[in-house]
Swiss-Prot record:
Naturally occurring in which organism (per UniProt): Bacillus cereus (strain ATCC 14579 / DSM 31 / CCUG 7414 / JCM 2152 / NBRC 15305 / NCIMB 9373 / NCTC 2599 / NRRL B-3711)
UniProt entry keywords in alphabetical sequence: Amino-acid biosynthesis, Aminotransferase, Histidine biosynthesis, Pyridoxal phosphate, Transferase
UniProt name for this protein: Histidinol-phosphate aminotransferase 2
Reaction(s) the record says it catalyses: L-histidinol phosphate + 2-oxoglutarate = 3-(imidazol-4-yl)-2-oxopropyl phosphate + L-glutamate
Similarity annotation: Belongs to the class-II pyridoxal-phosphate-dependent aminotransferase family. Histidinol-phosphate aminotransferase subfamily.
Biological classification of the source: Bacteria, Bacillati, Bacillota, Bacilli, Bacillales
Required cofactor(s): pyridoxal 5'-phosphate
GO biological process, one term: L-histidine biosynthetic process
Subunit structure: Homodimer.
PANTHER family registered for this protein in UniProt: HISTIDINOL-PHOSPHATE AMINOTRANSFERASE, HISTIDINOL-PHOSPHATE AMINOTRANSFERASE 2
Length: 366
């Protein structure tokens, strides 16, 4: 049986190992997963309380249009319900956008080190992928603008960026948007929006009034702590959302997921507390890095990226200590956990870098 030729160049997505899988390799002790940027504190207690009380008719299909959830999102964001599209996580929405917009021969433009699903789905649709290197961990919008051409159908901007945690500020993003043709869709992936504390971070939703070619993505998987429910959403012009709905699978968000997201979206106090604790956790890591001259990218997310050598070696050290982090070819990404979890990882990092310095001194004196 034949499939698309371009699939031969792709691999299925490989998530980080689960605690159960880690036990098979590193021994039967407890593991703390700090590899996938999940909320270590879980979801709002209101969600748990309401789901225990409520009864869902399991034999019936869910609301195919996620009407209640979309209306609550629209009301809070001051847009029309018709401007909101809900999906089974942002992964599905990225797939919907790619399938609806891209044709063979088109191209997309994005960063070289960013969320890989932009590239993945473009290749499936037979498109060229133009990747621009990050500038000190940040999207280089000036360079991206220079490679956009008449065949560029989508520019993907992950802001704040995964895996670096860095962000493009309001001035640079606005200037970039003004210079891009309205024939090119600009998708701004704000999966970590709720964690942002920077005062010059762009407020993108007001830009929809002026620019028809902007689509903003957000999720319930990160700050809201609902990753297992798989709920993400896009906000854009009504005409665009209507076209994307043609591609969207029917009944794509389960009744349970819609219920959980609806409740979670109303608990602002929970999000405020999560952001406060996360900011303190980032400060733990940043203080450690500064005190020990370890490079890091200042983060506006719930993770921190250290562009260091021997990432696999650090991963192994953390794994043996019971912590699952994410290694990359050029560094490590660590999800911010509880204070105690952060202290545990920092202790492992401290030992690793002390051993590295000691080894370097020994080699110099040999």
């Amino acid at each position: 049986m034949q499939v698309k030729d371009q699939l031969s160049s792709l691999q299925p997505y490989k998530p980080g190992k689960s605690p159960e899988q880690m036990k098979e390799v590193y021994g039967d002790h407890s593991f703390v997963k700090l590899a996938s940027n999940e909320n270590p504190f879980g979801c709002s207690p209101r969600v748990l309380d309401e789901l225990q009380k409520s009864w869902l008719e399991h034999a019936l299909y869910p609301d195919g249009g996620a009407t209640t959830l979309r209306q609550i999102i629209a009301d809070k964001l001051h847009v029309k319900m018709e401007q909101v599209l809900c999906g089974s996580g942002l992964d599905e929405i990225i797939q919907i956008i790619s399938r609806a917009v891209l044709r063979a021969g088109d191209n997309i433009v994005t960063a070289g080190a960013t969320f890989p699903q932009y590239r993945h789905h473009a290749i499936i649709e037979g498109c060229e992928v133009k990747e621009v290197a990050l500038n000190n961990g940040v999207y280089d919008l000036e360079e991206i603008s220079s490679v956009v051409d008449n065949d560029t159908k989508i520019v993907w901007i992950c802001n704040p960026n995964n895996p670096t945690g860095t962000y493009v500020n309001d001035r640079k993003l606005t200037q970039f948007i003004e210079g891009i043709s309205e024939n090119t869709l600009i998708v701004i992936d704000e999966a970590y929006y709720e964690y942002v504390t920077a005062k010059d971070f762009p407020e993108t939703l007001p830009l929809l009034e002026k620019h028809k070619n902007i689509l903003v993505l957000r999720t319930f998987s990160k700050a809201y702590g609902l990753a297992s429910f798989r709920v993400g959403y896009a906000v854009g012009q009504e005409e665009l959302i209507e076209k994307l709905n043609v591609v969207r699978l029917p009944f794509n968000v389960s009744s349970l997921a819609q219920k959980a997201a609806t409740i979670a979206f109303g608990d602002d106090e929970f999000i405020e507390e999560i952001v406060r604790v996360n900011t303190e956790g980032l400060q733990q890591y940043e203080s450690f890095c500064r005190e020990n001259d370890i490079p890091f990218y200042p983060s506006q997310t719930n993770f921190i990226f250290l562009p260091v050598e021997n990432a696999r070696e650090i991963y192994e050290a953390c794994a043996h200590a019971g912590f699952i982090i994410r290694p990359f070819p050029n560094g490590i990404r660590i999800t911010v956990g509880t204070r105690e979890q952060n202290e545990g990882v920092i202790s492992v990092l401290q030992q690793h870098f002390e051993n590295k310095k000691r080894k370097s001194r020994d080699e110099e004196n040999a």
